[in-house]
Amino acid sequence: YLDHGLGAPAPYPDPLEPRREVCELNPDCDELADHIGFQEAYRRFYGIA
């Protein structure tokens, strides 16, 4: 058990996070992502994810 008083470690950076944010800002992409998943929705709107 290691507790250095720093809280939880930072999660590993998600390489898809910038694309996920782009999709979330587009209401149509965001809605589609709710149904088929972010990566497929992004691919349909913007090309290869």
From Swiss-Prot:
Say if the entry is tagged with keyword Cell membrane: no
Q: Which cysteines are joined by disulfide bonds?
A: C23-C29
Entry keyword annotation includes Nuclease: no
- Modified sites of kind Hydroxyproline: P9
Residue stretches spanning the membrane: none
Which residues are listed for Ca(2+) 3 binding in this entry?
E24, D30
The molecular function GO annotations come to: calcium ion binding; hormone activity; hydroxyapatite binding; structural constituent of bone
Sorted keywords for this record are: Biomineralization, Calcium, Disulfide bond, Gamma-carboxyglutamic acid, Hormone, Hydroxylation, Metal-binding, Secreted
- Report the locations given in the UniProt record: Secreted
Q: Which InterPro entries match?
A: GLA-like_dom_SF (IPR035972), GLA_domain (IPR000294), Osteocalcin (IPR039176), Osteocalcin/MGP (IPR002384)
| Binding of Ca(2+) 2, residues | E21, E24
What functional role does this protein have? The carboxylated form is one of the main organic components of the bone matrix, which constitutes 1-2% of the total bone protein. It acts as a negative regulator of bone formation and is required to limit bone formation without impairing bone resorption or mineralization. The carboxylated form binds strongly to apatite and calcium.
Protein name listed in UniProt = Osteocalcin
Gene name of this polypeptide: BGLAP
